[in-house]
């Protein structure tokens, strides 16, 4: 009995450490959203010009997720995690030392390389290390780490950037990663690669129309979200005319609302996943369409950000659950593709927001983002009606 209890405690400790790692990786991806103005001021650039860094990061992840996953498919997972954390930490040290915007971008590319591998293996590792019968809870913990990156990571990173400079934000993330690495070295056993899939898995996955439809839905809805979200900090200050402190509070509110979305999905996701995702996309559409009208009031923007955060968490969880259900025989390949496709959406959205801000007006980012959100809503209704069973159950 004691051995089993200890074993379960150790198993949960391993999953929690992975969740902390997920928090750190997502924090570093999201945190530039709250630092764009400070970085732009530091390098004497326009905010919209600095925003291209978001697109470069996301598209490097998108481009390298599958190749890196395939290159490392036979590598023992503990060793792989240690190596990618070393790259991650070294890249953050370079971010801290960046003497030009070009060097900062190079350092972010290094982080993106580590990110590309991490997210292709994390979900399957969490499932493997979870106590018996607790796989869903293990995935929920990883999702919580992801949500907390927006709830705590991004706002804290912005606060550190405001008071100590944006370089210290990246340095602090590097320190957090170092501590997490030491915990992983201490806790993780040898983890031989399992069910990672290979190039042979790709034709099999591509022949699953339900899975391909989910991938398409993912890229469109993420593009919609990041068209506006990437520039929400300068939007709040320059368009709405509110303070930097309110921008921080708004990011905290939006991220915190993600926890509510996670709870809602945890309660209803098993039975009503498709309906939840479509409803969340509709909610995202409304939030984007009302972004500019809501900019005349702090209360209006605050309420809107709550619904926005709830919607995006449900969408993110719903997409991940469906991908895992539709590719149980090649989870690493499927999740590498998902990570790549998700980041194509991030990069595309950030680029669209960049172009709208530079050549039109930053005030229009919500309206422009609403266009792909509407397309995503229509597509979700179509595919969930066409594959109502396939999307809820595992295929073999």
Curated annotation (Swiss-Prot):
Any one GO molecular-function label of the UniProt entry: carbohydrate transmembrane transporter activity
Keyword NAD: no
Subcellular localization: Cell inner membrane
GO CC, one annotated term: plasma membrane
Record field: transmembrane: 15-35, 50-70, 81-101, 103-123, 136-156, 170-190, 209-229, 246-266, 275-295, 299-319, 333-353, 364-384
Topology relative to the membrane: Multi-pass membrane protein
InterPro entries, alphabetized: MFS, MFS_dom, MFS_Efflux_Transporters, MFS_trans_sf, Sugar_effux_transptr_put
Membrane topology (Periplasmic): 36-49, 102, 157-169, 230-245, 296-298, 354-363
Main location group: membrane
Protein family according to the UniProt entry: Belongs to the major facilitator superfamily. SotB (TC 2.A.1.2) family.
HAMAP family attached to this UniProt entry: MFS_SotB (MF_00517)
Function recorded in the entry: Involved in the efflux of sugars. The physiological role may be the reduction of the intracellular concentration of toxic sugars or sugar metabolites.
Protein name (record): Probable sugar efflux transporter
Organism (species): Escherichia coli O6:H1 (strain CFT073 / ATCC 700928 / UPEC)
């Amino acid at each position: 009995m004691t051995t089993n209890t200890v074993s379960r405690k150790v198993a949960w400790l391993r999953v929690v450490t992975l969740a902390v790692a997920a928090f750190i990786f997502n924090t570093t991806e999201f945190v530039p959203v709250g630092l764009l103005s400070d970085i732009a001021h530091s390098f004497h650039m326009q905010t919209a010009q600095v925003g291209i860094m978001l697109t470069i990061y996301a598209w490097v992840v998108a481009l390298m997720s599958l190749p890196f996953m395939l290159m490392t498919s036979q590598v023992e997972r503990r060793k792989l995690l240690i190596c990618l954390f070393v790259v991650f930490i070294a890249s953050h040290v370079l971010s801290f030392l960046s003497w030009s915007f070009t060097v900062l971008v190079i350092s972010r590319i290094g982080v993106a390389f580590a990110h590309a591998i991490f997210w292709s293996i994390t979900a399957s590792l969490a499932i493997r290390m979870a106590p018996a019968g607790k796989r869903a809870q293990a995935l929920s913990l990883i999702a919580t780490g992801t949500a907390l990156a927006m709830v705590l990571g991004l706002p804290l990173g912005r606060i550190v950037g405001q008071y100590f400079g944006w370089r210290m934000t990246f340095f602090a993330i590097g320190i957090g990663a170092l501590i997490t690495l030491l915990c992983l070295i201490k806790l993780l056993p040898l983890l031989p690669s399992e069910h990672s899939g290979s190039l042979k898995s790709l034709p099999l996955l591509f022949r699953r129309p339900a899975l391909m439809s989910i991938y398409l839905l993912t890229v469109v809805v993420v593009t919609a979200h990041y068209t506006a979200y990437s520039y929400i900090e300068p939007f709040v200050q320059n368009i709405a005319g509110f303070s930097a402190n309110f921008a921080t509070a708004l990011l905290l509110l939006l991220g915190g609302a993600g926890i509510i979305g996670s709870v809602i999905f945890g309660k209803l996701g098993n039975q009503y996943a498709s309906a939840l995702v479509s409803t969340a996309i509709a909610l995202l559409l409304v939030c984007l369409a009302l972004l500019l009208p809501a900019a005349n009031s702090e209360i209006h923007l605050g309420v809107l950000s709550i619904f926005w955060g709830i919607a995006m968490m449900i969408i993110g969880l719903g997409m991940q659950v469906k991908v895992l259900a539709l590719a149980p025989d090649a989870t690493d390949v499927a999740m590498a593709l998902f990570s790549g496709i998700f980041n194509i959406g991030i990069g595309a959205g950030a680029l669209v927001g960049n172009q709208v801000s530079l050549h039109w007006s930053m005030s229009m980012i919500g309206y422009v983002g609403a266009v792909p959100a509407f397309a995503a809503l229509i597509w979700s209704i179509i595919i969930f009606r066409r594959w109502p069973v396939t999307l809820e159950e595992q295929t073999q």
